[in-house]
Regions:
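Bacterial N-terminal signal peptides
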Residues: 2-13
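Compact, glycine-rich, soluble single-domain proteins
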Residues: 17-137
Length: 137
């Protein structure tokens, strides 16, 4: 019986979302989940049916090189920014929901930031903008 009660008390914490990063790009603020491990990057925003406004996911890649994204099992229309090691935007792309097309950065990148489609354009963010708030920077 005590084990059951312990599990019952722990159950709510198992479903809690991870801590969000507070990012800033120019004058725009954004909260982002942080995908660092291979498993987190692979899972990404798959199977999500909504993404709140001013929210996204920041992917950190192990290698600084050209990286690719795809939208398999991701029903949301997204935009992505590829960022260099300093957090500067080096490429912006739009991603089609559920597409298996592979989209790669034009330049080497350390990070990719996925947001709702059109968010970067709405905020006036373009190549060269710098993302602040990335851990370790």
């Amino acid at each position: 019986m005590p084990v059951f009660l312990l599990l019952l008390m722990l159950l709510p914490s198992l479903g809690q979302a991870q801590t969000l990063l507070a990012l800033r790009i120019g004058v725009a603020d954004l909260q982002a989940e942080y995908a660092v491990t291979a498993r987190e990057r692979e899972r990404g925003l798959m199977e999500r049916t909504e993404l709140p406004a001013n929210r996204g996911m920041l992917f950190r890649f192990e290698d600084f090189r050209r990286h690719c994204l795809w939208m398999k099992d991701t029903p949301l229309p997204l935009s992505a920014a590829f960022l260099d090691e300093a957090g500067r935007v080096v490429d912006l792309i739009d991603l089609e929901p559920l597409s298996k097309a592979i989209r790669c950065s034009r330049e080497p990148a350390r990070y990719a930031l996925e947001v709702n489609r059109g968010w970067f354009a709405e905020q006036g963010i373009d190549v060269g903008a710098r993302v602040q708030g990335i851990p370790g920077q």
